[in-house]
Amino acid sequence: DGKKVVIGANLDDKKFDVAVGLALHEGSHIKLSDFTLLRNLENSIPQEIYVLGEKMGVDRYTVLSTVKSILNYVEDRRIDSFIFKTSPGYKSYYHSMYEKYFYSKNVDKGLLSDEFRTEEIDSYMFRIINLHNKNRQLTALKGLKEIYETIDLGRIQRGLMRDTNEAFN
């Protein structure tokens, strides 16, 4: 809702750093993300994107959901980069979170395998949300290299993406 972060009560010592990293990340969304833009995202997406989706057999809701997921990925990288630069004491928690969700053996296996190589939304989304993983395969899907270059993780990591609106555009 853009106002609070809820953490589950079932935390053991092994999961604590991951949970703290996730809570810090989600809390940073509250401080840094533009929730007005996110609430109005459906109307911010150019109509031609919906038309293109329809031509490819993708309904309006799926277009919206996909754009929202990609925006969230870019926004996550922007926020995490900001926190890394401004709050270095939190890095270990973020590293724990990244190890669990992005750099796990299962993610690496999926990226290196023949899976998620069909030109459909799920394959693209798996590959996109793991573009910052060293095992990304930019030739796994048509256009993935261009998507990677458009997102420009290096620019984000240098702190050159200022806000949610810039992440969207």
Could you describe each region identified by the protein language model?
Residues D1-N169:
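Short, functionally important secondary-structure microenvironments
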